[in-house]
Amino acid sequence: MKLDIKGSMPKKIDVMELFARDGIQAIDTYLPVETKVWFINEFIACGYKHVEVTNFSHPRFLVQSKDAEEVLAGLKRVEGIHYKTYGMTPAAAKRAVAAREKGHPVDSMALTISAADLHGMRNSGRTRDEYKPEIKEMFNIFKGSGLKLDMAIACVYGSPCDGPVPVENTVDLIKWGLDNGLRDFTPCDTTGESNPVRSYEYMARLVDEFGK
């Protein structure tokens, strides 16, 4: 397939820095609060405008998440920076709202729903349909708080458990999210298997369905 993209590329892109959440969550040795805060501030000083700063998941699953509120308390809001957090449950959503009410820099929280059910079961113990009621509850918790809920969609190209994943799975999840008030979605190439052609075809399908 030959792609003619001359003149259609965006003039700029936004890059989100994920070190303080995704980058260290698999490290078993706990990193102290001051280390995380230092890295976050350094990334902001480098010019990143979107930074994912912490995880509200239970520390029995991820040792790095046991200090979420302390990390947020250690940060001073910088104008023009979007501070993003992560959480998978209504309890996490309540913690994010509480942190924002205390004046800590929290602008949004992401959750992850998998486009492939077997991966979803192994990653979070839920199928897509089983997780949807919790997502609705999280959205309702955020109402009036000023926080945005970002639905990250895992395995949009393929799953290590399920194999190839059709783009229709993404389309169906975004449609459901829109119908239930969500406006922020992040498709994720969890397996790192995409290429320029597949990415173009995938995004073209989403643009055809939802517009730019």
Language model regions located:
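N-terminal small/glycine-rich loop or linker at the start of catalytic domains
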Residues: 2-28, 111-123, 144-161
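Glycine-rich, positively charged N-terminal anion/phosphate-binding segment
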Residues: 4, 33-34, 48-81, 86-109
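Conserved N-terminal beta1-alpha1 strand-loop-helix module at the mouth
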Residues: 10-52, 64-68, 77-78
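Hydrophobic faces of well-ordered beta-strands that scaffold small-molecule active sites
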Residues: 14-22, 49-53, 81-87, 107-111, ...
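Active-site mouth loops of central-metabolism enzymes
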Residues: 18-37, 82-91, 121-128, 155-169
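Glycine-rich, proline-tolerant flexible connector loops at the mouths of alpha/beta enzymes
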Residues: 49-74, 111-126, 157-161, 186-197
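Alpha-helix-loop-beta-strand connector modules within alpha/beta enzyme cores
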Residues: 61-85, 130-150, 199-212
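Distinct, well-ordered alpha-helical segments
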Residues: 64-69, 93-101, 161-173, 195-207
